[in-house]
């Protein structure tokens, strides 16, 4: 598909910058499909639990989640993922999937993600208010909760001075990493 064309087009580059800052989420299937382009083997990416009863702590045992490599073109070079606190839901899941690939080539730069990977449940209350909460706790491969976000490998904040000068310090750091 189109991703094959893009990866072929970018094949001469030293690496890839994936900027997911301010991305509120989307489709979990797309997160997996994209991340599958960066691994050559099946990998454990985390665990999920499901509600099993009415009690506060009535959850199933953690069930493993795996990422299978794509059967299409896969990227073999460095990747820098740019994140901030406004990366939620499927974006948070994508960052976790990418961080689970232990090939030494994927680096998260920026700020902690916003979290929210737990398959949200939404309902309307009798008074018309809506409620939304994580229905299935989601953990990384080390059993650390993903709901509160994922810390970057390299933490960088854009200063007000940088913003006023339209200087993107995260992009600059990504270029620095890719040129090493």
Residue ranges and their predicted role:
Residues 78-100, 105-114:
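Extended C-terminal subregions enriched in glycine
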Residues 9-25, 81-82:
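Short acidic catalytic loops
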Residues 18, 38, 79, 98, ...:
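Terminal peptide-recognition signature
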Residues 25-78, 121-122, 139, 145-149:
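Gly/Ser/Thr-rich loop/hinge elements
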Residues 12-16, 41-44, 76-78, 102-107, ...:
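Loop/turn elements at helix/coil->beta-strand transitions in domains of secreted/extracellular proteins
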Residues 2-14, 29-33, 141-180:
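Intrinsically disordered, Ser/Thr/Pro/Gly-rich linkers and terminal tails that flank
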Residues 22-24, 85, 112-113, 135-137:
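A mature extracytoplasmic/lumenal domain signature
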Residues 110-126, 131-133, 139, 145-156:
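C-terminal soluble interaction/assembly domains
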